[in-house]
Regions:
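Non-catalytic cap/lid and distal C-terminal segments of serine-dependent acyl enzymes
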Residues: 1-338
């Protein structure tokens, strides 16, 4: 029987954040069938991170008449012994502008500390876990994949396994090829403030406003994550491109590039080598070039002698959440190996 519980968690590190986002957030937790505090062997834990514009509960949405949802798939795989019993945690890393990218920011608050310290400890206190990073993995798609990559690198004391599904990387392409669309959207709206106001006033901006508006808001939100500046109104961050010409602004561009997982690999070799499992998956036609980012990350890992599982499958950036249970299973099997 599927057992997903919803909790409200009060964060200390997110309280009074300059963006004004809530510090009381919902956390959903999947517990395996027959979960028991008296079980001899504690349960491994997987933290599952949503992409930009989503929350953890996004993964728990009803899959419709012709597909099983994620919790039901996990139940079925556990019953078939295809997946060791495990706990899966779905945190909320969203912000007013879309996403925190799960990093610490003077604008959005310390979301990495929230996830890696507050939530990890909260889960270990509340549930029957190993209370060890060696039995704790992190997985996510898109911005969630980025979050998994950077948390595993920067907080390898907390996570022993990593899965990135089309995680943000190779910023030279990812954060330049949408600059023209962003400028068009901002110009049509009458500037940054007007654009943000119109976007947030829409009852369903992701569905009604179109791709140009979405990539524009995504780029604006990245400034609050990676190039924060509290003196900048509305977005509280410095954009890395000129709003008139689109040319890169060197100072801000360098700050953004420092957060590219592709560049971070060389700074975190020992952290990555300590992980029990690394998995990179993506569609072979990802329109954001993230399959190429993964290939470049894999090449660096291989150069450092760090083992990994990398896979590409037919498809673009979206529409592949049905692969998540298999990724979780592959990760958890490595976590429970002695």
């Amino acid at each position: 029987m599927t057992y997903v519980r919803a909790f409200e968690h009060t964060s200390q590190v997110l309280e009074h954040n300059p963006m004004g986002d809530p510090h009381v957030r919902q956390v959903h937790v999947y517990l395996p069938p027959d979960y028991s505090e008296r079980r001899k062997e504690p349960y491994p834990v997987v933290f599952m991170l949503a992409g930009w514009g989503g929350r953890g509960a996004t993964y728990l949405a009803d899959a419709g008449a012709f597909a099983q949802g994620l919790p039901q798939r996990l139940d079925r795989m556990i019953a078939a012994r295809e997946l060791p019993p495990c706990i899966v945690v779905f945190p909320d890393g969203s912000t007013r502008l879309g996403a925190s990218q799960y990093v610490n920011s003077i604008a959005n608050g310390n979301h990495m500390d929230y996830l890696c310290d507050e939530l990890v400890d909260w889960v270990d206190e509340r549930f029957h876990t190993h209370k060890s990073r060696d039995y704790r993995g992190i997985i996510g798609h898109s911005s969630g994949g980025f979050g998994a990559l950077v948390c595993a690198m920067m907080r390898s004391d907390r996570f022993g396994a990593l899965t990135s599904s089309a995680g943000d990387s190779w910023y030279e392409f990812l954060y330049t090829h949408t600059i023209p669309q962003t400028l068009e959207a901002l110009r049509a709206a009458g500037g940054v403030k007007s654009f943000v106001d119109q976007f947030l006033a829409s009852p369903n901006p992701m569905g009604l406003l179109g791709g140009r508006a979405i990539v524009a808001m995504l780029n604006l939100s990245m400034a609050s994550c990676f190039t924060p500046n509290l003196e900048v109104p509305v977005i509280k961050g410095d954009l890395w491109f000129d709003l008139e010409t689109g040319e890169l602004i060197d100072e801000h561009w360098k700050r953004l590039l420092a957060w590219d997982p592709l560049r971070m690999v060389d700074r975190h070799v020992s952290d990555l080598r300590s992980l029990r499992f690394i998995q990179l998956e993506s569609g072979s036609e990802d329109e954001y070039g993230l399959h190429l980012g993964h290939r470049q990350i894999a090449k660096k890992l291989q150069r450092h002698g760090i083992p990994l599982h990398i896979d590409e499958y037919p498809g673009k950036h979206s529409g592949h959440h049905h692969r998540m249970p298999l990724r979780i299973a592959r990760m958890v099997k490595h976590l429970v190996e002695s």
